[in-house]
């Protein structure tokens, strides 16, 4: 009885599930192995036919399953003794014949009925999969490798010819067939010799494939991919071929360009080669041909010979041994830039060009990256990227993204050459991001985790621009901005001063010193360079852990000062703001103090030296306000036991300035002195929160006591009137501001009237008119003027002005009107006054924000103390936490009075989210002299105010949590006996609340809930 394989397994071989296909193949091979030959020869033939026919299925999963199983069936037959093998598998050659017979596309020849395109496609791809089934292990080694090792190339040559025949059937199967052949040759490369390589090349010549992308890839594989070239020096070719049988020989560049462009090349009348039209029936494929993956890496593997460095004498002696190959720059220019990105190139060709750029960035070494940004490439890239309606806009944007990705993956070799070529190369532009609307340069600069060497090289690119492009304002400004962006993106990684020092030096020179040939453009750079320098220092200041060869330099500000001093002492340039004798003495004394401070390595000395260095830099910048600060810092450094009040006021003065660097620096230095901060220093900060957010408050904070007193006296009356009739604090502020504005407007109108009177009197005098022609209001009496005109009409011919008198009168009139214009310009208009009021309010609010930031630093310090819970901190813990209770009332008042919601939210977050989150048990050692009950009463008084301000919900919520927090502290320190006092206080508050309170009942509910939680504890103790 003959055996049979399970027919259901053939259906499972076509499954979309990989595991099911695999199990079906294993089961079918088991069934087939159990059959006996020659009894079951018919079943073997059925299986072979069924598997080969199954390859022509239009389902890809079916082709995969049947191809996998076919490999195992062939392998099973090959391992049988000769003579016992099944029909169709007697040998591998017989299998090729069987495959061609079953999957024959010409089966309908001679009949009127033609094969459908779908069926033809299935048969051709089925045959390809049938041939590929021979390439799976272990069949591949059994058939191909063993034959080549024996020097037998018959089957390999037949296999090659069958693949080529199949490839030439239809254009849509051409590339898959040739890629399969290429992969086969690549696997057999270690076992091939010159003879087998020659046979392959002759087959390519036979089919006229030498000068095609497929032929090119084969030549490159045989010549450069192996340990040595397998291409013989002489080939008997019938069709045109490559010069010296090497596609990359220098003389082959024009021909190589035409081949890569997929153009047909034929011999001309002179024995040369000429390009013809594109091959017929060639379908455009939006994928790059695999020849590029072979060609591009060759330019970086060192196998291409370059004799440009060899002396002429050596060239003459070794001319026969050394061959000059095409190098990447010339290849890219002709084969890519002038071919795929030519102005007349089609969109399809340019599309492939963008794919070539992508492939080149991944394949070629970093030294060649710059050549990729050639003229036509840059033009096309910019033109296609700038407009989203362009045909190639999407692929151009994808190309830019792939460039960024390639630089991210290999920043050490690709980032700097890419940026250099993109921005400063022969075809680059500093406006690349703007031209392409892509932000590519910004992304490249911001690549994370760059090695220090790459970071130094990146900064060096823009440093060279500062050196080479001194006279070009746009380049210099771009270089300054780019350096700032680099520092901003990598400020955490920049901890070595040797990286930044070469870059900072030209910026310092540009900011503080005159150039030898200063013109108007370069003068503009002084201020720009100074601003960028301050911004760079502001970014770098956050990194305190820095390395420097000079141990004395401990901050970026000190390094900047050192650079200024070095340039000044070298007499390279003159200071823009030269120092007089008095300032020189102040500077020298400050530098002496700075040297002494730097010898100490404490956090406080670092803060003091950084602050002193920054003030000296400001002195060189012409900031006269820094003089008093320098003197105070020098005096502070001379004494060991100093009050922190002076430093606090200095930091506040820096905090009030517009420069972000000074604001950031003041907070950082405040952190260094935070352990020494006492209640007196904190009270200075808390007093600022009480300042009114108007011109009066601005004068109080920024203009000194005298100016504040004057403004206060002028505005007292109007403020009292506005306060008595208002329903809320915001209305009071508004009425006060309106009154101030009205008074200022009346005063301004009076000044304008006086100026007009003076101008009119001067005009009357200059024109020799009677004094009484001007009335009390400073206006000209028109009736009198007409009378004078009538009286003088008869005598006008008697007397007339000569030219000299006319010129003199003209000068007098010009001077009068000039003085009037200057006087009027000094008077604020209505819009100017409104702007000044708004600016004053914004400045006060902004200053309060920064003060809250300083208070937050102290709160954070207290949090660290409580978390540390160390014995060495136990004595200091109670004192530090005690000061926090003094924050409550000033902050509540600030929220009640402020017009700025973000400020109210920030204070609320600090109180409720930080201070009140500290466990009350940590306050057990706090100062007993603090009157907590007094603070509670003040809190309740604020709670019952009829003017909760513009942020009533935030204000009342803070009052409730503040009262509850103070109540918990009161009980924690005084014990449960204090609960009665708290209940009495809340009872009294409840009575007042019933009569005039505007807050909600949640304040009392929160207290009751807390009492409920304490009740059980009290009962347990009793």
Curated annotation (Swiss-Prot):
Which keywords accompany this UniProt record? Nucleus, Phosphoprotein, Transferase
Chief subcellular location: nucleus
- Where is composition skewed (Acidic residues) in this entry? 706-719, 728-748, 781-802
Q: Where is this region: Disordered?
A: 706-748, 778-805
Into which family does the record put it? Belongs to the MYBBP1A family.
Question: What other comment is given for this protein?
Answer: Present with 4490 molecules/cell in log phase SD medium.
The chemistry this enzyme catalyses reads: DNA(n) + a 2'-deoxyribonucleoside 5'-triphosphate = DNA(n+1) + diphosphate
Q: What is this protein called?
A: rDNA transcriptional regulator POL5
Question: Which gene name belongs to this protein?
Answer: POL5
Species of provenance: Saccharomyces cerevisiae (strain ATCC 204508 / S288c) (Baker's yeast)
How does this chain assemble? Interacts with FRK1.
Subcellular location(s) of the protein:
Nucleus, Nucleolus
